[in-house]
């Protein structure tokens, strides 16, 4: 299961959806990136659905999206890196 997480302007809580296939989540990720670049003049709406929770739908304005990330949700909890943005400095 792959998760796609959005951070929104002025919102402390991210929105996320889950997809079974990486290709599906990557396609949505690319669509969101394109919409984020095109929002200077318009305010496109993006609708997202979730594979894990069938009735879950999310609609957001593309111009309110600050960041988007993909991560794999594994069933193994031990030793996995915490999802989120991080900076590794050696």
UniProtKB/Swiss-Prot annotation:
Domain of life: Bacteria
Family: Belongs to the UPF0367 family.
The protein's name: UPF0367 protein P9301_01411
Source organism of the structure: Prochlorococcus marinus (strain MIT 9301)
């Amino acid at each position: 299961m792959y998760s796609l997480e959005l951070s929104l302007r002025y919102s402390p809580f991210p929105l996320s959806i889950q997809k079974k296939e990486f290709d599906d989540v990557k396609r949505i990720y690319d669509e969101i990136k394109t919409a984020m670049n095109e929002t200077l003049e318009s305010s496109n709406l993006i609708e997202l659905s979730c594979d894990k929770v069938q009735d879950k739908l999310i609609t957001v304005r593309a111009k309110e999206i600050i960041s988007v990330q993909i991560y794999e949700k594994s069933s193994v909890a031990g030793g996995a890196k915490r999802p989120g943005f991080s900076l590794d400095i050696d």
